[in-house]
Amino acid sequence: MENVYDLAIIGSGPAGLAAALYGARAKMKTIMIEGQKVGGQIVITHEVANYPGSVREATGPSLIERMEEQANEFGAEKVMDKIVDVDLDGKIKVIKGEKAEYKAKSVILATGAAPRLAGCPGEQELTGKGVSYCATCDADFFEDMEVFVVGGGDTAVEEAMYLAKFARKVTIVHRRDELRAAKSIQEKAFKNPKLDFMWNSAIEEIKGDGIVESAVFKNLVTGETTEYFANEEDGTFGIFVFIGYIPKSDVFKGKITLDDAGYIITDDNMKTNVEGVFAAGDIRVKSLRQVVTACADGAIAATQAEKYVEANFEE
């Protein structure tokens, strides 16, 4: 079938790249479609210490670069195009992008998840102007300044420690009276002299004229609010939000079975409720969202897609 791919992968994080590698190596005509940038959430990770075989100096971007090179080496195609609709019911699946339409015998959904917003006034208006969701991207903008980190899980605390390499002081703002991060991570954080903690608190509002100038915090126990102002010398300060992610599955609603949170439901073979459609990585319902599990998902999904195509399409 001319202009019909054996495998189309939507998304290019670790799951999508692993799927592209396995699909291309299996001699499937493979295309990977990405709407923003290759790499997914891992590109904002300054250190990848829990991926087997990664060296101490491994960063998210460097790992993604090697994965992409591998997929390209085996012939996987890549296009940058934002997907606006999908038709997954037919034997030939149709993926509609802003630039073009793509047809495939099988599809892997690997769109991942996006950072969850704090949801306070001023946050979106001042994103990129003091508000950030990426320590690796923006830490150096706050050299020797004060920074607030919203969140208390593994990512929040790890990124706070990274930010402490640049900032004069880092305050972790957490809704509870204890961190949710792993104990080993907590131990490191409590020993870091640059880290401070604002317990039982939430950020209520972010203010500024084109740049973050102040922020209002609320104690959730007492109800008391406190406004922090940038000092005159700095002129601003950083607010980094790390409170989890939201699945990027809006385009698949009504087309595929999702759970209440919007994650795609699959079986152990990454199969969705639609024949020939698989899901991999952070977009699907799973107990652990890490690079290593995303890669495993991608490999399984591509292998199952290969079997599906062989069983349902003639040469």
From Swiss-Prot:
It is found in: Cytoplasm. GO terms for cellular component: cytoplasm. Binds 1 FAD per subunit. It catalyses: [thioredoxin]-dithiol + NADP(+) = [thioredoxin]-disulfide + NADPH + H(+). It is an enzyme of class 1 (oxidoreductase). FAD binds at residues 34-41, 282-291. Its EC number is 1.8.1.9. InterPro entries: FAD/NAD-bd_sf (IPR036188), FAD/NAD-binding_dom (IPR023753), Ferredoxin-NADP_redctase_2 (IPR050097), Pyr_nucl-diS_OxRdtase_2_AS (IPR008255), Thioredox_Rdtase (IPR005982). GO terms for biological process: removal of superoxide radicals. Homodimer. PANTHER family: THIOREDOXIN REDUCTASE 1-RELATED-RELATED. The active site is a redox-active disulfide bond. Belongs to the class-II pyridine nucleotide-disulfide oxidoreductase family. This is Thioredoxin reductase. It comes from Peptoclostridium acidaminophilum.
